[in-house]
Amino acid sequence: MRVIFLALLIARKEGKGDENTIIKMALAHDLPETRTADLAYVHKVYSQTDDMRAARDLFAGTSFRDFENIHSRYEKRDCVEAKIVKDADNLDIDLELKELEEQGHKLPAKWKAMRKFVRDKKLYTKTAKSLWDKLQKANVAQWHMEANKWKKIPSAGR
């Protein structure tokens, strides 16, 4: 769900893309992985999946046949909507890593250089790069601490 909102944010900040297509693409972008698995980077070096076939099989004979084409466009990155959704998908990974880092996990530190490479070489939009930069300095739990009902409602929890 977060990918959808990130994609819409990027599209609106960039002033580009059809929002209807972006929403559908963001909904469908990972669905074939329910059949092929979400392979980690190292697994992709040694394994191949056929996400296009998985999408075709997944949507065939359903009311969502149009999603096969939407997924195909996403995989090809041949339109601005696909690039926006891919940027959102990458930012979602970075948000998850930031959340893990703030929980004390060590994995995010190990991925820092690789994710910086993704920021510099793989993100398509200026907005996504700007959001990535801001995320590195952000406290992802700050909203929760500031909106905490214990602060706003003095009698809460008594």
PLM region spans:
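Alpha-helical, largely C-terminal catalytic domains
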Residues: M1-R158
